[in-house]
């Protein structure tokens, strides 16, 4: 690791091409494997230490520089017999190594900001947990919103060119380009029917995609800041990036130079908000739909003219938040009125006023969750619980533990829901599916099995909060009901574990 730290220090002295030698360091690939950066082929091969060889990696890299090199497809089912090793394993190893190396410049910027030696130029370091307080605080005051699917380039060359600005190392990026073209089927990696966040995509492609998103968001951020405070100190990043894209012959002058004053006018509304999560974003505004339309067409033109990414404006709907719901991070989010009556008395006169307030409402999408449970055989398509036959051979403790873990994860994640009736239905399906699985294992009926165990089995499905409150308030059922209605955002949960992982 001392040698690794030595190479990192080169970036602090503004030396270029310092990443390229790291490609030929064996500890880079060991680091990528040991930390489990991507649960893929590397973690599924038990004999990794015996099969891996830096010599083979160097030979693969050398082949990419040969003019008449042997192109190996990742989907080739009949590899040459003289290779003598798992080509998919080593292609995956190189991909993981590239991901570690290319992330170094981004990590150094973050470390420098934490040490106080440099101010981070990127403003995309906010946690996903800040989204939920933002929605509760800001959304009730907004009127219109759009759920936008962020398009991603259909060709990896666009992603590599975008990365050139952030990682100024031509040698490494040239080798990365050769690797992507030679060892991957570009038509099958990124298609409109396959999300960039699919688990089959390596970490490297997530890094390339995030650099593309960071690039276009930095342009949006610049324009938004310039509308409120025109400061030269923050504009040098933007003009440096314009010069960079002029070098690679992008039509920047067509997008920015001609319409720059008009673009700044688009962003003058202080109530325009932008939220990104995974591959989607939300645009929301308090103003009329006219401003939302301007934002929509500006984003489409930015993607098409600046990044050569096709996007259809007709698929971006502008909805009134009080009448439509947004599918957001597994929730159905909307704004609903909360009516209250206030009685005021002044001397002998009394007044009754209707006070209407907007409230951010989050619901559990019951139909998609039942579909997910039916897909992994916890229930049928109608939501009727069935036994999990593949778990019937496990011990009783393992069966109960698996069901309890899934149930508590879902309860933990959807604790932010304003109405938990749908969540109770999901928990009921899991509980009864667990009982049917145990009854199937012991060759008994559900009724007989429940009589033998009593209520102890169902108590396992209570969350920690429910158990604590049941001990503190054993008879105060109103307290428990009030607790169930409260909305709690847990900061240690940002995604639902895929139910397939529990197989």
From Swiss-Prot:
It holds the Pfam family MatK_N. GO terms for molecular function: RNA binding. HAMAP family: MatK. The gene is matK. Belongs to the intron maturase 2 family. MatK subfamily. GO terms for cellular component: chloroplast. It comes from the Eukaryota. InterPro entries: Domain_X, Maturase_MatK, Maturase_MatK_N. It is found in: Plastid, Chloroplast. GO terms for biological process: mRNA processing; RNA splicing; tRNA processing. PANTHER family: MATURASE K (PTHR34811:SF1). The keyword Cytoplasm does not apply. Keywords: Chloroplast, mRNA processing, Plastid, RNA-binding, tRNA processing. The keyword Lipoprotein does not apply. Its main location: plastid. This is Maturase K. Usually encoded in the trnK tRNA gene intron. Probably assists in splicing its own and other chloroplast group II introns. Coiled coil: none annotated.
